[in-house]
Design a protein with these regions (language model features):
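CBM-like carbohydrate-recognition segments
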Residues: 243, 424-427, 432, 442-551
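Aromatic- and histidine-enriched alpha-helix N-cap/loop-to-helix transition segments
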Residues: 206, 242-254, 301-313, 363-374, ...
Length: 551
């Protein structure tokens, strides 16, 4: 049987199966077929708004014409639109404008009664028909983008859509399936996972596969000179032009972490290039014992506590994975740089000007403190320099006094887990518990895919597990382990909704450049290196350490 005949047969079977399960499809529906190569935004064909039999006939005629004599496209997806509902245009416009987070309107839209102009939810965002100027500016319908999308999509000319003159539109949900390995994979309908595949029953295997795919994506972002391609806004394949020392180093760190769950010797040349880039471009020695990592543009260079910490974490992880001490001298000088930014009470200074070394900002962002504490502890475990441990203990006195648990920060969770391995004192465990216990509701209701929440929860989980192993019953009972496990499962599942599976990537300008990347939906479908590293770290911890209900 030819590839085309297999595809045609599978499509018929899928449509029959959908009809059996969805009585509402007996009413008017629309069929959509999205198709395209790996390196271009997909095209989308649609049937008329009609009964299923008529729509199916139109679809089969189209696929005969499109694919019978030529190879199937790399990506093919079918959608059945249902719940076609007439709504006042102004109501939908306001709904989109007042969303709590951008780009979370999850319905398709038809712009006339017959839906002769209609777009799937994925098309609406892939073509920036709904967009925001930034993550903190409200969404709006872009009339120019809408009319350009209409012109691109339909062969026959369509009248110009003037948003101010619209009275009603028709919204709809879809049942969809993606054609992969000669079969159709069902995709979720509605809510946060709309239009993407379900997590397989073997969850760890599914996440392991995500790690493998995403680490390959992140590895591919390292250029020959060792610098990362920093990121893209996916809809129009626009590069994000900034760069950042902290994110460079922590992205290499996450790529090194992947060696804990997979063996990828082919990654080493680019990892070495990325480390070399960091040490030649950002590393500056103040004297023979002290070094700092610089960040920023020419004329605006600065020294960040977090950049020194990120570089130490990267180089210490390299030493842990390879058992080679090639970079230890750099790590020790960078640690001395951190010690210069911490006073005798454990209070930190976050940012200095470079090359003057004068104060720029005493405090910039909470995560520098936890990151610095973790970096010192990682080096302490390599060289046993007691100054490092004593400094972290002083820092923790400040964290506890200033009630830093209110920030539910992932780096604080990491460094607390690390410190309690070395100094298992109650006060440190209690701080670690409070870092997540007071934020259960916030985490449960968080409808964005920022990946640091899973990292924070997994570091806490490892710490709580040690309480259990050590028989510290009173503290363990305060940990609410069943609730913590539920939250971990929830976040691990939820964060897959920000992964560019092919069924989502195909609607963006260059699917091949963002396939298997993690993205931030509410910030213009942003793909940035730190979005990859945080997700990788969280999922690696889940695959390696999470036991769930296992005995």
């Amino acid at each position: 049987m030819t590839a085309f005949l297999k595809f045609q047969r599978q499509m018929n079977l899928w449509l029959e199966q959908v009809v059996q399960h969805v009585p509402s499809l007996k009413q008017d529906i629309i069929l959509f077929l999205s198709y395209g190569p790996k390196d271009l935004r997909c095209s989308v064909w649609q049937s008329e708004k009609t009964n299923l039999e008529q729509a199916k006939k139109q679809l089969l005629d189209f696929i005969n014409e499109q694919f019978a004599q030529s190879p199937l496209d790399d990506y093919i997806k079918i959608d059945v639109a249902y719940n076609l509902t007439k709504q006042a245009w102004k109501e939908v416009e306001q709904q989109v404008h007042h969303q709590f987070h951008n780009n979370h309107y999850r319905k398709g839209i038809g712009f006339d009664e017959h839906c002769s102009v209609a777009f799937l939810e994925q098309e609406i965002y892939g073509k920036a028909i709904i967009r925001g100027l930034s993550y903190d500016k409200p969404n709006f319908f872009d009339e120019t983008n809408l009319n350009y999308a209409v012109k691109q999509k339909y062969n026959a000319p369509k009248p110009q859509i003037k948003l101010q003159e619209l009275q009603d539109i028709w919204t709809f949900d879809t049942y969809a399936a993606f054609y992969e390995n000669e079969k159709f994979i069902n995709l979720a309908s509605g809510y946060d996972a709309n239009g993407i595949r379900a997590i397989s029953s073997n969850k760890k295997q599914h996440f392991q596969h995500l790690i493998e795919q995403n680490s390959e994506f992140l590895h591919d972002q390292i250029q020959e000179n060792g610098k990362f391609i920093y990121g893209y806004f996916s809809a129009y394949d626009r590069d994000i032009r900034n760069y950042n020392t902290v994110r460079h180093c922590t992205s290499v760190y996450a790529l090194l972490e992947t060696f804990e769950v997979q063996s990828k010797p082919e990654y080493w040349p680019k990892i070495h290039a990325a480390i070399h880039y960091a040490l030649t471009k950002f590393y500056k020695e103040k004297d023979s014992e002290t070094a700092f990592m610089i960040d920023g543009k020419e004329g605006e260079f600065e020294i960040k506590l977090g950049a020194n910490a990120a570089a130490i974490l990267m180089l210490a992880k390299y030493q842990e994975i390879t058992q080679k001490a090639d970079y230890q001298k750099y790590v020790e000088k960078l640690a001395n740089g951190i010690l210069k930014l911490i006073d005798s009470n454990g209070s930190t200074t976050h940012v200095l000007n470079y090359p003057d070394y004068d104060l720029k900002e005493k405090f910039r962002i909470i995560y520098y403190d936890g990151e610095a504490a973790l970096a010192l502890l990682r080096l302490y475990q390599i060289n046993q320099d007691s100054r490092l441990l004593e400094t972290v203990k002083l820092m923790f006195e400040c964290f506890i006094e200033k009630r830093y648990e209110k920030y539910h920060d992932h780096w604080l969770s990491y460094c607390t887990n690390e410190l309690t391995k070395i100094c298992p004192e109650d006060k440190y465990f209690i701080f670690g518990l409070n870092n997540y216990l007071k934020h259960f509701i916030f985490i449960k209701n968080r409808k964005t895919t920022y990946a640091t929440l899973l990292e924070m929860l997994m570091a806490a989980y490892k710490m709580v597990n040690r309480l259990k192993e050590q028989g510290r019953t009173a503290l363990f009972e305060q940990a609410y382990m069943p609730e913590l496990q539920k939250l971990i499962e929830f976040r691990a599942d939820f964060q897959t909704t920000g992964f560019f599976y092919p069924e989502m990537a195909m609607y963006m300008a260059r699917p091949d450049k963002i396939l298997h990347a993690f993205y931030i939906r509410h910030d213009r479908f942003r793909v940035r290196i730190d979005d990859q590293e945080h997700n990788l770290s969280g999922y690696i911890a889940y695959v390696k350490d999470y036991k769930g209900d296992e005995p």
